[in-house]
Amino acid sequence: MAQFVREFKEEDYQDVLHIWDKTDMGGEHRGDDLKIIEDTINFGGKLFVLEDDDHGIIGTSWITNDQRRLYLHHFGILPDYQGKGLSHILMEKCMEFAMDEGLQIKLEVQRTNHTAKALYKKYGFKYLGDYDIYIVRNPEDINLDNL
């Protein structure tokens, strides 16, 4: 059983959605559809997939690029493959991409995900301090009348 990282191809889309569903990372219900993936890739990002020779795609890492920094998200591995050190294969590819681009790389992680936080720290990520992140996921929820 050998694993390797490669770039996303359109025919990977359903497998990627399956991983995102099984790892609670997102999917079409959060706007993570094929068009958005392709747009972010065309704008200098990458979607890497971790593939197993015997079992197909088992992990993903999506990197978007705003031309100032890279954003690492949707980094995850199917539960049956977690705890086997496979995240290092995927993370090394991400960090190589950041070095090649010469851009800083940033990510968000749930406070309770201690395993992921330990991995990120091993690769040099630093905690930025106590600040909260807010988002409006649905533009229809924007209400300027209350201002």
Task: Indicate residue ranges for each PLM-predicted region.
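Terminal substrate-recognition subdomain of acyl/acetyltransferases
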Residues: 122, 126, 133-147
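Conserved beta-strand-loop-alpha-helix junction that forms the acyl-donor binding cleft
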Residues: 107-117, 135-139
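Conserved N-terminal entry element of GNAT/NAT acetyltransferase domains
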Residues: 1-11, 140-147
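Conserved acetyl-CoA-binding loop-helix of GNAT-fold acetyltransferases
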Residues: 77, 83-96, 118, 122
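Acetyl-CoA-dependent GNAT
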Residues: 3, 7-74, 78, 91-92, ...
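Conserved GNAT acetyl-CoA-binding A-motif
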Residues: 98-109
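Short loop segments at secondary-structure junctions
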Residues: 52-55, 80-81, 137-141
